């Protein structure tokens, strides 16, 4: 058996269904021969974003795989790998490498060394017989601990080497439980607190700890907010839901965090970022995380509980029930306060959410979108900048993994690949990306990939003909050189690539256009709806 076939056989045993990539990489062709569907993209970054989403929407039960050629293909891939690393997403990256005799010749790009800073592990194959061990190490790291890309670089002169046999059994995920003493202390602190808040990060998604999070919240009548990455970990139509954090946040999140006397973060890193909610100063914090490197990193904690989010929450529920009993606390008073705060905040935004203006209010577009889709059967993601901040505070998720939030680093154009990868892994769902006229300039050509590969996503494009949030930052550049002016006819662009494209300019046409776009996706055709919007820059910040 040759190296390429051995790699494909390992991928088959690991349950891989798709190999996303760009030629030349022999896994694409040999995988196709073995029944693994190759997905060929127009630019490597989008393919990595697709692999990223496959892992996300399955909580890592299916792992996204991306492969590319050595040299320019690997170099082009850097941004997509870096994005997955910053968001702690496990993906398998399989670049070809230069022949071993040339691998260290300047200036050949050596992925397994150059990408060590943006991967959880990066390893070259120096001998074909080592392939089972190398892949076993990679998949163990992908399934265990904090997520991140694992990279295996296969030199071009290794692909045709022979392997006698494959001794390979897929490794199982490893999970670590918490220190019982820390759990008991955390339970006591939560029971003593008068105004605690639960803050859930994306670790709840990876651990599939949604039932435990809900049980703990209901047992202690604790309001729950999430990070942007953790959004949808707790149903946002629940009486105890506050919504999600981010650069823009609901008024409920601001109110309850500010008044909290204890914040319990679970499955989160508390990383300081411009695109996350800042923890109020001076609050006691319990930090439950899988990664000890996150403890006291950016936010000082009173107590750390290390372990898998599901195991931590299950142990904490047992400890609370042992100390308090199994009867849930009365959630009535806090639920009323949440409802009052939410209603007052939302009322202040209703003029924008229901505006009849032309150009359109982006808030009106997204409000109408939310009320035109089956929320429970939809997966949606934002893009960098205004689309993120205009969408995330107002979109109310009801099902786990129905919102792909991100923000540790914010590459424009990330959302398109996320929606496409989500649709691959969850074809029964309506998968939507919301982006602007800046983001489409980075990855828009891969809308053609969605058409060609029969991935019927719904793409919501907010076009205000400029980089609106840069106007105040670049007044001279704009006045003298129109440097912030960007745009095009993106509905026509979508049609030219074989998709459904429609431009919408009047408020009364928003909902009918959304329905036509959804109908197109149901026929198997990707749809791009281009909404001509105002230069809106106000977001829900406090």
Across the structure, where does each feature detected by a protein language model lie?
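N-terminal alpha/beta PP-like core and its mobile active-site loop of ThDP/TPP-dependent enzymes
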Residues: 1-330, 449, 456-459, 489, ...
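Short, internal active-site loops enriched in acidic
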Residues: 156-159, 386-387, 534-536
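Thiamine diphosphate
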Residues: 102, 247, 296-298, 304-306, ...
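Conserved structured core elements
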Residues: 1, 21, 207, 254, ...
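Short, contiguous strand/loop micro-motifs
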Residues: 14-15, 66-68, 173-174, 198-201, ...
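Phosphate/pyrophosphate-binding active-site segments
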Residues: 129, 165-166, 187, 282-384, ...
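Short helix-loop-beta connector
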Residues: 60, 375-376, 427-428
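Active-site diphosphate/adenylate-binding microenvironment
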Residues: 4, 12-14, 22-34, 339-422, ...
């Amino acid at each position: 058996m040759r190296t390429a076939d051995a790699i494909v056989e390992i991928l088959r045993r690991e349950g891989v269904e798709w190999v996303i990539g760009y030629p030349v990489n022999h896994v694409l062709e040999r995988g196709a021969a073995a029944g693994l569907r190759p997905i060929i993209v127009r630019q490597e970054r989008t393919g990595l974003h697709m692999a990223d989403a496959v892992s996300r929407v399955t909580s890592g039960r299916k792992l996204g795989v991306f492969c590319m050629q050595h040299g320019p293909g690997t170099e082009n891939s850097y941004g997509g790998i870096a994005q997955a690393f910053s968001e702690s997403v496990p993906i398998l990256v399989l670049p070809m490498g230069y022949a071993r005799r040339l691998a260290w010749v300047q200036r050949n790009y050596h992925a397994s060394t150059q990408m060590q800073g943006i991967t959880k592990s990066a390893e070259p194959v120096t001998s074909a017989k080592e392939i089972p061990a190398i892949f076993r190490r990679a998949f163990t790291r992908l399934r265990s601990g904090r997520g991140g890309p694992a990279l295996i670089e296969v030199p071009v002169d290794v692909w045709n080497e022979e392997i006698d046999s494959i001794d390979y059994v897929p490794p199982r995920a490893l999970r670590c439980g918490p220190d019982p003493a820390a759990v008991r202390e955390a339970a006591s602190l939560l029971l003593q607190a008068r105004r605690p808040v639960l803050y859930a990060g994306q670790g709840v998604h990876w651990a599939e700890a949604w039932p435990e999070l809900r049980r703990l919240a209901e047992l202690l009548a604790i309001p729950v907010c999430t990070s942007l990455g953790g959004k949808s970990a707790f149903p946002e139509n629940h009486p105890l839901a506050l919504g999600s954090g981010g650069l823009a946040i609901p008024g409920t999140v601001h109110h309850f965090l500010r008044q909290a006397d204890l914040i319990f973060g679970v499955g989160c890193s508390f990383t300081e970022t411009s695109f996350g909610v800042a923890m109020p100063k001076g609050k006691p914090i319990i930090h439950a995380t899988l990664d000890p490197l996150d403890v006291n990193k950016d936010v000082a904690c009173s107590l750390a509980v290390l372990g898998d989010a599901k195991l931590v929450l299950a142990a904490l529920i047992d400890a609370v029930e042992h100390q308090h009993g199994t009867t849930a606390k009365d959630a009535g008073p806090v639920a009323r306060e949440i409802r009052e705060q939410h209603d007052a905040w939302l009322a202040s935004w209703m003029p924008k959410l229901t505006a009849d203006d032309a150009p359109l209010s982006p808030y009106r577009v997204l409000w109408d979108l939310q009320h035109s889709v089956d929320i429970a059967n939809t997966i949606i993601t934002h893009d960098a900048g205004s689309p993120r901040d205009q969408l995330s505070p107002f979109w109310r998720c009801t099902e786990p993994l129905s919102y792909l939030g991100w923000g540790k680093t914010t590459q424009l154009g990330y959302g398109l690949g996320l929606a496409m990868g989500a649709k691959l892994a969850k074809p029964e769902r309506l998968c939507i990306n919301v982006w602007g006229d800046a983001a489409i300039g980075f990855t828009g050509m891969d809308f053609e990939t969605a058409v060609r590969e029969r991935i019927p996503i719904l793409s919501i494009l907010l076009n205000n003909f400029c980089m609106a949030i840069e106007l105040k930052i670049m007044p001279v550049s704009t006045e003298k050189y129109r440097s912030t002016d960007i745009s095009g006819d993106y509905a026509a662009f979508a049609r030219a690539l074989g998709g459904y494209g429609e431009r919408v300019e009047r408020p009364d046409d928003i909902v009918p256009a959304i329905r036509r776009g959804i109908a197109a996706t149901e026929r198997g055709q990707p749809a791009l709806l281009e909404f001509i919007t105002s230069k809106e820059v106000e977001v829900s910040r406090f």
